[in-house]
Amino acid sequence: MPIIKSAIERAKTNVKANERNSAQLSTMRTAVKRFEQAKTAGADNAEELYRKASAAVDKAASKGLIKRNKASRDKSRMAARLAK
């Protein structure tokens, strides 16, 4: 356990940031998964779900949760999947 006051504060901040980042990543993964499931099932709303998933990936990349190249790769793969 930290003893120094600033270390205690940083530990609290790290816990909050971890929760926030985990929630954001989970939201992104869920959006991508919903798009994949809709496309597999042949649902009509696949294009709308693609836009939501793409926005979620962009948001995660802008916040530094995933790297820009991964975001670009994921979006490219989803776009190719949508075009099929």
UniProtKB/Swiss-Prot annotation:
One of its GO terms (biological process) is translation. Pfam families: Ribosomal_S20p. Keywords: Ribonucleoprotein, Ribosomal protein, RNA-binding, rRNA-binding. InterPro entries: Ribosomal_bS20, Ribosomal_bS20_sf. GO terms for cellular component: cytosol; small ribosomal subunit. GO terms for molecular function: small ribosomal subunit rRNA binding; structural constituent of ribosome. The keyword Cell inner membrane does not apply. Belongs to the bacterial ribosomal protein bS20 family. Binds directly to 16S ribosomal RNA. PANTHER family: 30S RIBOSOMAL PROTEIN S20, SMALL RIBOSOMAL SUBUNIT PROTEIN BS20C. This is Small ribosomal subunit protein bS20. It comes from Levilactobacillus brevis (strain ATCC 367 / BCRC 12310 / CIP 105137 / JCM 1170 / LMG 11437 / NCIMB 947 / NCTC 947) (Lactobacillus brevis). The gene is rpsT.
